[in-house]
Every structure is written in structure tokens, then in C-alpha cells.
Amino acid sequence: MPRSLSLSALRHLSAAIALVLAAALAAPGAARATFSIVAYDSLTQEVGVAVQSKYFSVGYAVPWALAGAGAVATQANVNVSLGPRAIALLKSGMPAAEVMRALAAIDSSFAGRQIGIVDARGGSATYTGPRAMDWAGGETGPGYACQGNILAGPAVVADMAKAFRETKGELAERMIAALEAAQKAGGDKRGQQSAAILIARPSRTNPEYNERYVELHVEDHKTPIKELRRVWEIFQGFHLAGAHLNYAAAFEAEGRKDLADAERQRVGETLQRALARGEKDPSVLNGLAWACASNDIFLPQAVQAAQRAVDADPRNVDILDTLAEAHFRSGNAVKAIEVESRAVTIDGGKSQYLKDQLTRFRGGK
């Protein structure tokens, strides 16, 4: 056997590989029977995709989003390359409907695709190829496109769109509500397995949000939408509260106080919802309580959440510090000193931060 290939053989091998890759791109991909929504928020300029399927790791291939450009869902007999191609066209300023026509022109197997697109101005388009498996179809409206294939029936898409229109709150909240409504209407008639949500939001100070403001995946689960809801609620306390405060600071620096206040308000509303649903995760409660207390908003709720977190994890000095801060900001220095003293004792006096906090509370500053 030769130890190496000749130059001529390498050229033939390279040509063969190129032909195989070209054929793979042109051919229908693995079927992704699924339902999805692509959507736009005119207030925050967020764009995103939420999706569920009886397919492992649907979030790997279906959702694409870029702030200032738009969002795309690629499904059915999926050609994954159409996702980034569509984003590039949207980024150039091409409206959603024109992007769809452009994709059809470059894909010889477009009849097997299902695609939803929303652009950064709220324009939307959906396409279901004649080779998509029944029931398959879509619906568009201002700022959204819903679509699905191998569904229980047309009510899946109709109810998904209706829930999105009627649900209030953040874009992610509205999109997850849309998935829940679609599943309630019958969903993917083969069942459930994975779900995902991807949202991008413009930011100059935090450029990472331009591609990933919210990104959550449930790869393999008996009830993936229910699990997506659960991890979304955790995500709000761990990450989203901080993101809202980042936007608030950026808007404040630009002199846009109304927008800064709106970002802080969203943190408070998230905390209120966590309390209302009986959230038990001490980390979630602590994150939201600290975000509110440190910004002097929703202070009674911050005290309540922090106390609930302490009850669940009574020797966690970080959580005790949050409770003390919330009491202090609420005007109860005596209680703040009592709680912070407990934190210092548990810590054994090692943390200078905790000791400084105690000094601050005693000084009334």
C-alpha cells in the first residue's frame, strides 16, 4: 500500500469530496418534524425563534438570529445552510419576503423545506413546501411567523399565533406561551422530545447580546416545553435580571431615563411572578432579590424573596447578605445588622466584604 498519495490522486480525491459536499447541500436533510415561531419585539428590537420537535436537539439546526438583522427557523427536510444564508441576506437589509424568494432561487430542493423568517423591522414570511409532511402549514402577522409540519392539525399553528398575540411581557415569555398553546392543541403528532429558544437583542455595551441574549436548549426530554418553561424561569434569576440592569445602565448613560426605568421594571415584574408561582429555588430568589434591592425597586418583594431564599438555605452567607441589604434599603437598619451579623458569624469573619457591609449598616450609610 502506498505511504502517500500522488498530487494527481489528491486532486481527484479533492474533486470527489467537493462533489459529495455539493450533493449533500442540495439534497433534503434529515426530517425535522416540528413547530416553531419566529418573532420580533418592536419595543426592545429583539428577534428570536422558539421551537419544539419529536427530534433530538432541535435547537442545533432550526433557530438562527442576529440583532439588527432578523430571525430564521429552518425545518422539515432541512437544509441547515439556509439559516446562515438567510441571516446574511437579512443583515444586508433585505426584507423577510424577499429573503424567502432568494432562498427558493438557490435551493433546488426547496419544495421539501419549511421556513419562517422575521426581519428587524417586523416584516415576516413563512413557507411550507408541497413535500412537507401533513399536516403542514404556517401563519404570519405583524412581527411573527408560525409554522409546523407533521402536526395534529391546523389548530396547532392557529393557537400558537393566537397565544403569541395575546400574551403580555417579554418576547421570550410570549414565545414560550405560543409553544405551550401549540402543544395543547396537539403539537407534533409523533410526540415530544426537544425544544429550544434563541433571542438576539441589539447592544453596544454588551455585544454578546447581539447573537445570544437568551439561549436555552432542552435536548432530550419527555415534556420539553414544560422543561423549557422551568429553565426559562431559572434563567431569569441567574442571567436575565443582570442583563436588564446592564441595559438600564446603558440607557441611563444615554439620558434615556424612561427606557432605563422600563428595564428595571421588568426585573421587578419578574420577581413578582416568581413569588406568585411559589418559586423555591434559593438561587433564583436571591438573584432577583439582589437585583431589586441594589436598585431600590420592589423592596417589599425583595425582602420577601430573600427571606424565602434564606429559609431554604439558612447558612448561605451570600443570601443572608441579600436579605440584609433588602432590609437596609427598606429602612430597617436594625434587622439588616441582625442578619448581616449572622452572615459574618457563619463566615467566621473571613470575608472583608461582609464585615464592611456590617460596618455600613451600623453607620446608616
Residue ranges with predicted function:
Residues 242, 283, 318, 352-353:
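Start-of-helix register in tetratricopeptide repeats
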Residues 32-190, 197, 219-251:
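Alpha/propeptide regions of enzymes that mature by internal proteolysis
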Residues 246, 287, 322, 329, ...:
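"A position-specific structural signal for the A-helix of alpha-solenoid helical repeats
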Residues 254, 295-296, 330, 365:
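Structural motif corresponding to the intra-repeat A-B loop/turn of tetratricopeptide repeats
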Residues 259, 276-325:
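Alpha-helical adaptor scaffolds
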